Amino acid sequence: MPNYYDELEIEDFAWDPVARVFHYPCPCGDRFEISKGQLRDGEEIAICPSCSLIVRVIYDYLDWEDYVTTDDEDDGGSVDTPLSNTSPDPAYPVVVGSAEVESQSKTASSAVSSQKEECTSLSDRLAGLQVESGKEDDPVQEHKREDSSDVLH
């Protein structure tokens, strides 16, 4: 009987559509991996290719009976994985289409511009309070003037 490093549920693993494996971070910095084919065959050991650690994967074999495709047939584009509440590991990003990236870029840029507007509004409010209190020669005011001159260029 092998000596397992840990026991993990399949729901804790993330799906890598490029390598077509479920993966989970390993303490060595690499990742434990197990394929759908291994799960269909009843295997329950995920191996880290960089070190000697193995984990036992806990899953309900009956949930995996529905997978009638082989790993080679999965190249057709559809990935039939169970729903999971886990998100992919940020160390292994998933490539998305250019339209999605462009959309995300526009969303991020609009968020930045709204933050700039909010900062400007707060700076204006602070400047007004400083004028009321008699502290007009303040570094915040000078910084604000420098920023506004940068915007004009």
Curated annotation (Swiss-Prot):
GO terms for molecular function: ferrous iron binding; iron chaperone activity; oxidoreductase activity. Its cofactor is Fe(2+). Residues 69-153 are annotated as: Disordered. Pathway: Protein modification; peptidyl-diphthamide biosynthesis. GO terms for biological process: protein histidyl modification to diphthamide; tRNA wobble base 5-methoxycarbonylmethyl-2-thiouridinylation. Component of the 2-(3-amino-3-carboxypropyl)histidine synthase complex composed of DPH1, DPH2, DPH3 and a NADH-dependent reductase, predominantly CBR1. This is Diphthamide biosynthesis protein 3. The lineage of its organism: Eukaryota, Fungi, Dikarya, Basidiomycota, Agaricomycotina. The gene is DPH3.
